[in-house]
Amino acid sequence: MSVLDRLGQKLLFAFDPETAHGLSIAALRCGLPAGTRAVRDIRLKVSLCGLDFPNPLGMAAGYDKDAEVPDALLGLGFGFAEVGTVTPLPQAGNPKPRIFRLTADEAVINRLGFNNEGHAAAEKRLAARKGRPGIVGVNIGANKDSADRIGDYERGVGRFARHASYLTVNISSPNTPGLRNMQAREQLGELLSRVMAARASAATQPPIFLKIAPDLVEAELEDIAAEVVEKRIDGIIVSNTTISRPPLRSGDVGRETGGLSGKPLFERSTIVLAKMRKLLGPGIAIIGVGGVDSAETALEKIRAGADLVQLYTGMIYAGPALPGRIVAGMARFCETERLKSIGELRDSHLDRWASKPLS
């Protein structure tokens, strides 16, 4: 981390996490943070689901909830950015405080609860960037008090299909009561059927990804994989935050309710990723997320079966230069290992990760 990055982090860490997040969004809107411009290397290009990603590193959903700064994020060196989660109606989310830094663990616990400005606000911003280059996905969710949560996802597809490079169906946040129950096979089957029907009726038909939780057992993973294959979903994102608590060094704050992200999530999310790759086979796209904070952790996700990777929490601790550094590290790895494409690395550690228990 550079001196400027350290100073910026120290300044932001002087504020509570939610205020710091708002300041970082405002800074990106003004063009203030200077990231490390990502190298353009043909070996890092990934063609997936009809999209050409300039590199495999993306910004995960949860940072730019209301589609305020997707182009600024791409300017930091990300190969793609995912905005949201957006719900049909605006909602305030859960009571504050609801974000907690676990600095000793380079982790965060959040219980935000899909706080966002709603479909209309996000759609207006995304419509305004029409014609600009860059891959921007939209992560869609359901309102907490909705009487028809599946209908909320249908509305999300209908609203954003023409604006999104891809859509992510997020049913894995732990902070909306009952949402994760939609991962159960019967509910999931109905959800995916209706989502795919909504896409079929849209004028534009972007790829559909399903974002799953890391807190699943083998039988649940098998059910999800079966539904993904049967309903012809384009890909999955593994994984959301975890409600489990691996050994942490951050004391009482580590016992806060909510989803844990960052470095402690890497192991379990990568095991789930590999197990899903085994279940889905080689042809379905997988985006790996959870604990990515360096070129090596990003590369290991790919070795475990990911086509693309995402990060968020890592940038809280390493600053806006992180995506550029990771992409440069990936390019150096390709050069050192004489790879013609980063895709050659995929699945090279698949058996190692897939054989680990979900403990």
Curated annotation (Swiss-Prot):
Q: What is this protein called?
A: Dihydroorotate dehydrogenase (quinone)
Mind telling me which Gene3D superfamilies this protein's record contains? Aldolase class I (3.20.20.70)
**EC number(s) reported in the record:** 1.3.5.2
Q: Which family does it belong to?
A: Belongs to the dihydroorotate dehydrogenase family. Type 2 subfamily.
Source organism per entry reads Mesorhizobium japonicum (strain LMG 29417 / CECT 9101 / MAFF 303099)
Catalytic function, reaction form = (S)-dihydroorotate + a quinone = orotate + a quinol
Query: Which keywords, in A-to-Z order, does the entry hold?
Result: Cell membrane, Flavoprotein, FMN, Membrane, Oxidoreductase, Pyrimidine biosynthesis
One GO cellular component this record assigns the protein to is: cytoplasm
Which GO terms are recorded in the biological process aspect for this UniProt protein? 'de novo' pyrimidine nucleobase biosynthetic process; 'de novo' UMP biosynthetic process
Active-site residues from the entry: 173
Write down how the cofactor binds this protein: Binds 1 FMN per subunit.
* Role: Catalyzes the conversion of dihydroorotate to orotate with quinone as electron acceptor.
Localization recorded for this chain is: Cell membrane
Q: Does the keyword Flavoprotein apply?
A: yes
Q: How does it sit in the membrane?
A: Peripheral membrane protein
**Residues reported in the UniProt entry to bind substrate:** 65, 110-114, 170, 175, 240-241
- Pathway this chain belongs to: Pyrimidine metabolism; UMP biosynthesis via de novo pathway; orotate from (S)-dihydroorotate (quinone route): step 1/1
